[in-house]
Amino acid sequence: MMKKLQEMQQKVEETKVRLDTITVEGTASNGKVTLIMTGNRKVNSISINEKLGGFDREELEDLLIIATNDALEKAESVNELEMKAASAGMIPGM
């Protein structure tokens, strides 16, 4: 049983490493604001299209929040799927 637990822990750790290599993209305003994030929910980059124009600071902040939340939702989905795959066969409640 300990060996099985160690194998499962190893799979989870490998999955965490793999999630650092998976990226998702969140966007706002038809792609004029883009945020790239890893499957582990770490922001890699934020891009603002130079043609965005016409937005004040508060509107731009709102667009950044929208793009961030979009990326977070996608990263959470990827993370959940990867962790489910890694924990397949685990004993429930462990």
Language model features by range: what are they?
Residues 50-52:
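A short acidic/small-residue loop/turn micro-motif
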Residues 63, 67-75:
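Stable alpha-helical structural segments in soluble proteins, enriched in small hydrophobic residues
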Residues 34-36, 60, 65:
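Short terminal (N- or C-terminal) low-complexity/amphipathic segments
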Residues 27-46, 55:
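N-terminal intrinsically disordered, cationic/polar leader segments
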Residues 54-62, 78:
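Residues at secondary-structure transition points
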Residues 5, 41, 64:
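Residue-level signature of catalytic and energy-coupling elements of molecular machines
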Residues 1-21, 25, 74-94:
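Long amphipathic alpha-helical segments used for membrane anchoring, targeting, substrate engagement
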Residues 31-34, 45, 67, 90-94:
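Alpha-helix boundary/capping detector
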